[in-house]
Regions:
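A short beta-strand motif that forms part of the nucleic acid-binding face
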Residues: 22-24, 111-113
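A short, exposed loop/beta-hairpin motif centered on an aromatic-Gly-Thr core
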Residues: 24-34, 97
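N-terminal segment of the canonical double-stranded RNA-binding domain
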Residues: 1-14, 19, 23, 74
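A short, flexible beta-alpha/helix-coil linker loop
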Residues: 23-25, 104-105
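A short mixed-secondary-structure module that forms the rim of ligand-binding clefts
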Residues: 31, 37-38, 42-45
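Short, charged, surface-exposed hinge/linker loops at domain edges
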Residues: 2-4, 42-99, 103-111, 117-121, ...
């Protein structure tokens, strides 16, 4: 899933404290604004991934205009793509048991077919996703 949430960058000694008012417990820190943008995207992606995995309700994002920046703080929009994040970080292989006709297994073995690779490619094609 793709999401966009407002983040609040608050200056602090040595950099910025970055929080997402709509997502409880989602925050990070950075030394610079460019680093903060990367760190914020990573923190948001991780938190939303966790919420999806736990079947937690994901709140609607507030309008960015609802965040008031003061004392040098500012708001910006951060995007997160949990599918892309999963493809980068959730790569542990899982074992799947499947059944195919014996004749098909025999033919595939004769042709040195990699069953795992074929199944992965077929699933990605069927689901309309590509490798990260």
């Amino acid at each position: 899933m793709k999401y966009i949430y407002p983040a609040l960058f608050q200056p602090e000694e040595g950099g910025f404290f970055i929080s997402f008012p709509d997502i409880d417990g989602c925050f990070t820190q950075a030394s610079t604004i460019p680093e903060g943008l990367d760190m914020a995207a990573d923190a948001l992606s991780l938190m939303l991934w966790h919420m999806e995995e736990e079947h937690m309700e994901i709140p609607a994002p507030s309008p960015i205009s609802s965040l008031n920046g003061n004392n040098g703080s500012f708001a910006t929009l951060i995007s997160a793509d949990t599918l892309a994040y999963r493809q980068l970080h959730d790569t542990k292989a899982v074992r799947k048991n499947l059944s195919i006709p014996r004749w098909l297994d025999t033919l595939a073995v004769q042709h040195n077919i990699n069953f795992s690779n074929i199944l992965q490619n077929a699933l990605m094609r069927e689901l309309g996703v590509s490798k990260a």
